[in-house]
Swiss-Prot record:
Keywords: Hydrolase, Protease, Secreted, Serine protease, Signal. GO terms for molecular function: serine-type endopeptidase activity. This is Serine protease SplA. It comes from Staphylococcus aureus. Changing S92G: In strain: VBI-M0894. Residues 1-35 form the signal peptide. It comes from the Bacteria.
Length: 235
């Protein structure tokens, strides 16, 4: 991946600054104008698919089964992941699903930026994780020109972890790499990429440093990746 491609997690910005990419992620009027057409805040995240989305410190994840969240390796590797709790479908106005401590992490053994995070079932508020989230179903597949949406927490700390959804189109898929034009920002790492039926196609992991509204990248869930995830869902 070239210098204009950058990881979308706030935890990675220190590394990327040396590549001259970090400043390109914000304050681009032409990008913002495009984003206004296809980005909306989700103020009530208590219903599917929004209640399957969780916030990490500097990233996003999606619930796929009992106590089981899918996100990026670079989010899971964050030094803060065990210190900062996972917040289930936090939004600006809706009732959140609780804050949960991380139990363990399982990284995908291949090069793909994919990891499984297991959380403890009971939140600090005494809520049950599995009763307060929904599990996102996997899509059978996807192809170029399919419409998609991504849901997550762009610039989480700056926006006080408001949830946003953006829509776009798949440009192409090559193996486990998916390129699409849905707008994303730092904090969207690990955001679910959903089809028109709100089925899980993959997760976002990086984007273009020139114009995030034109080119972003996701880990496309091939049968092999889906098998890895399913084998690591808590029973």
């Amino acid at each position: 991946m070239n210098k204009n491609v950058m990881v979308k997690g706030l935890t990675a910005l220190d590394i990327l600054t040396s590549l001259g990419c970090a400043e390109n992620i914000s304050d681009q009027p032409h990008s913002i104008a495009k984003a206004e057409k296809n980005v909306k805040e989700i103020t009530d995240a208590t219903k599917a698919p929004y209640n399957s989305v969780v916030a990490f410190a500097g990233g996003t994840g999606v619930v796929v089964g009992k106590n089981t969240i899918v996100t990026n390796k670079h989010i899971a590797k964050s030094n803060n992941i065990f210190k900062n709790r996972v917040s289930a479908h936090h939004s600006s106005k809706g009732k959140g699903g609780g804050n949960y401590d991380v139990k363990d992490i399982v990284e995908y053994p291949g090069k793909e930026d994919l990891a499984i995070v297991h959380v403890h079932e009971t939140s600090t508020e005494g809520l049950n994780f599995n009763k307060n989230v929904s599990y996102t179903k996997f899509a059978d597949g996807a192809k170029a020109k399919d419409r998609i949406s991504i849901i997550g927490y762009p610039k989480g700390a700056q926006t006080k972890y408001k949830m946003f959804e953006s829509t776009g189109t798949i440009n192409h898929i090559n193996g486990t790499i998916m390129e699409f034009d849905a707008y994303a920002q730092p904090g969207n790492s690990g955001s679910p990429v959903l089809n028109s039926k709100n089925e899980l196609i993959g997760i976002l992991y990086a984007g273009s440093g020139k114009d995030e509204s034109e080119k972003n990248f996701g880990v496309y869930f091939t049968p092999q990746l889906k098998e890895f995830i399913q084998n690591n869902i808590e029973k």
